[in-house]
């Protein structure tokens, strides 16, 4: 199948970057956005940072038919957008979201769903202006571990766009591994209002992060996955030392976070296995407390 139309469902920071790179590679891209971002995109999309470009883009508030649809909305909006995608032929739907459970929600409404994980860095400097902040890797795959033509097709489009992308047979492991790392970094940085590097530099914060990671490791072990969570948390925090986590940015902007789909998912899975994820639950409740005061 020849891919021509690619849709970005949720053209925020990451969605705008991915969409821009794909459009620059010659594909027709539909940017689905809302509010001030939609109004700004009607005037054009600016990319700065590792790549500089000014693009005229096709943007809309509702999804349309496409060959591939990348879902890049916040996890708490997944169900809402999944219902909208069910009303069109969205093609192969690939989540590039944070947290656990997005793919299962999408699969209730969409014909073909792939899981995805990306470490590319994007920040919205202003509405209609995305900063390409960091190169990374993007992995896509079937949730049941099969290697499929659809996953390879999606990876090929991303590679055409100049991204490092690979179709893999262990996407569920990668989604959980990213969630465990996020669980140890994001809430701590959000509550303490610090950059990622402080999680390893400050011994008090590192003690909490290591405990969160160990609970995640135990849960993943019961799922059949071996993951050295604490080492990975340290590595990611050091590599992104100057970054402000998305959860910190959300709280600073008075917005809801994705904590329910990160620490909340670990707590929930732990309960299934009889593992008490007390530190994850504490961070979950602290972030909930901050959110409720917004």
Curated annotation (Swiss-Prot):
Pathway annotation from the record: Cofactor biosynthesis; coenzyme A biosynthesis
Binding site for substrate: 178, 182, 186, 196, 243-246
UniProt-annotated location(s): Cytoplasm
Record: active site: 178
SUPFAM superfamilies cross-referenced by the UniProt entry: 6-phosphogluconate dehydrogenase C-terminal domain-like, NAD(P)-binding Rossmann-fold domains
One GO MF term: NADP binding
Task performed by this protein: Catalyzes the NAD(P)H-dependent reduction of ketopantoate into pantoic acid.
Name this protein carries in UniProt: 2-dehydropantoate 2-reductase
Organism: Archaeoglobus fulgidus (strain ATCC 49558 / DSM 4304 / JCM 9628 / NBRC 100126 / VC-16)
């Amino acid at each position: 199948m020849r891919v021509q139309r690619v849709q970005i469902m949720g053209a925020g920071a990451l969605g705008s970057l991915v969409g821009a790179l794909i459009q620059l590679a010659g594909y027709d891209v539909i940017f689905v956005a809302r509010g001030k971002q939609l109004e700004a995109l009607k005037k054009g999309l600016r990319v700065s940072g590792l790549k500089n470009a000014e693009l005229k883009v096709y943007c809309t508030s509702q999804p349309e038919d496409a060959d591939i649809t990348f879902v890049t909305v916040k996890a708490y909006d997944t169900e809402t957008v999944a219902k909208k995608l069910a009303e069109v032929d969205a093609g192969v739907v690939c989540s590039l979201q944070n947290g656990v459970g997005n793919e299962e929600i999408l699969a209730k409404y969409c014909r073909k769903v792939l899981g995805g994980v990306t470490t590319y860095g994007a920040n919205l400097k202003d509405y209609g202006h995305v900063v390409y902040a960091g190169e990374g890797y993007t992995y896509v795959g079937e949730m049941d571990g099969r290697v499929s033509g659809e996953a390879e097709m999606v990876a090929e489009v991303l590679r055409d766009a100049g991204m490092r992308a690979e179709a893999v047979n262990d996407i569920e492991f990668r989604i959980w591994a990213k969630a465990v790392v996020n669980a140890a970094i994001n809430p701590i940085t959000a509550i303490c209002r610090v950059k990622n590097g402080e999680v390893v530099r400050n011994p008090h914060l590192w003690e909490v992060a290591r405990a969160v990671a160990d609970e995640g490791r135990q849960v993943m072990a019961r799922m059949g996955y071996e993951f050295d969570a604490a080492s990975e948390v340290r590595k990611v925090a050091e590599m992104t030392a100057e970054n402000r986590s998305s959860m910190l940015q959300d709280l600073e902007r008075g917005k809801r976070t994705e904590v329910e789909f990160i620490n909340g998912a670990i707590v929930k899975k732990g309960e299934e296995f009889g593992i008490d994820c007390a530190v994850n639950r504490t961070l979950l409740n602290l972030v909930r407390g901050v959110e409720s005061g917004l």
